[in-house]
Amino acid sequence: LMGGYFSEYQGFDKDISLAISEQYLPIGLNSIVPKKPFSVTLSITDKIDTLVGFFGINEQPTSSKDPLALRRIALGIIRTIIENRKNLKINDLLNYSSRLYDDQGYNLENKDLQKELQDFLKDRFRYYLKDKEIRYDIIEATLSSFSLNNLFSSFEKAKCLNKVINTQIGIDINSCLLYTSPSPRDVIQ
């Protein structure tokens, strides 16, 4: 927050100062997310850099501990993307961020970095969908065709299915699909 005030005082553009102020948003599950383009960009790239850096040195949350708030950071990425109604190529950002570490001479120890980050973000997306009261079977179907490059689209599909599934039309469609569809993945696509 203070960085935004300092940058404005030093004559930086208001959008840049706002982005600096909002780079750590959202700070919790129900707090606001940045909305302006510079703010969204800085917030997401800062969080991606943080995740790549910590996962790169094998500092990951355990099932009971997350002292670096990496789960909150991942949810911040997910919420910022979804609430701004964007599909970003998160896999490309993860790759680019890890290459920047290499370019600067930092040897990231974790050889499974990309896969672990993808799994971690997928798990956080599962948590986000549960928090939005999406049915378990719809969450699993959504995750079966999931890509980090289409978080917003995946969320919209899950939300739509969740809304329709208990209507008469949804019940009828579900009955038909039980006999014709080989897997939940075919339904969600």
Predicted regions, residues:
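Amphipathic alpha-helical "coupling" segments that flank catalytic cores
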Residues: 1-181
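Single conserved hydrophobic/aromatic residue that forms the stacking wall/gate
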Residues: 179-189
